[in-house]
UniProtKB/Swiss-Prot annotation:
Protein name: Dephospho-CoA kinase
Family: Belongs to the CoaE family.
Superkingdom, taxonomy of origin: Bacteria
Pathway, per record: Cofactor biosynthesis; coenzyme A biosynthesis; CoA from (R)-pantothenate: step 5/5
Species of origin: Bifidobacterium longum (strain NCC 2705)
């Protein structure tokens, strides 16, 4: 039996990363979803919430004990953001997310292949405390991603364009990846490619 293999999976919003992640999970990989972890730590009782309130003040919390997402969106990411607000929030959340990812790895010693599904991997690659055996990026043209965001996620075109602008570019993601998956291919063809990649990882362990 070989050792565990750790894979970084990334891709721009609406590029098809979730489809690739779902297929890898079906094939037997342990899937660690960083978006899910980011939501988990700011739920009522979550480890990040008290630190966020201490850093940004009581306006960051709603009366029902949940995070005030519209306020955070405006004061950390939006027009009313103070200088360095995004970095202050990241400094709270990122170490907690990494710690939770490490805990999940530790809880599954049987996992042969572990997928760290990280939308912003290119942005955090220098700080993340994990070494990856491979990094996969999933790509699609911006026009296709915009269509998906408007038609499938109910965003306005302006919202969709803003979300893409605030992420790293395809070139930046390609620079850290050794495997590129093009999600413009027909779905069966793309899933077959994912299966071939996974089989290669299993054989290489």
């Amino acid at each position: 039996m070989g050792t565990m293999m750790r894979i970084g999976l990334t891709g721009g919003i609406a590029a098809g990363k979730s489809t690739v992640a779902a297929r890898l999970k079906q094939l037997g990989a342990l899937h660690i979803d960083y978006d899910a972890l980011a939501h988990q730590i700011v739920e009522p009782g979550g480890v990040a919430l008290p630190q966020i309130v201490a850093e940004f003040g009581p306006d960051a919390l709603l009366a029902d004990g949940t995070m005030n997402r519209p306020w955070i969106a405006d004061h950390v990411f939006g027009a009313n953001a103070a200088p360095g607000a995004r970095e202050r929030l990241d400094a709270i959340e990122h170490p907690l997310i990494y710690a939770e990812a490490a805990r999940l790895e530790h809880e599954h010693p049987e996992a042969a292949i572990i997928i760290h599904d990280i939308p912003l991997l290119a942005e955090v690659i220098d700080d993340i405390p994990f070494a990856f055996d491979h990094i996969v990026t999933v790509e699609a043209p911006v026009c296709m991603r915009l269509d998906r965001m408007v038609e499938e996620r109910g965003m306005s075109l302006e919202q969709a364009e803003a979300r893409i602008r605030h992420q790293s570019s395809e070139e930046e993601r390609r620079a850290i990846a050794d495997i590129v998956i093009d999600s413009t291919h027909p779905l069966p063809e793309m899933l077959a490619q994912v299966g071939e990649i996974y089989a290669g990882w299993c054989a290489g362990r």
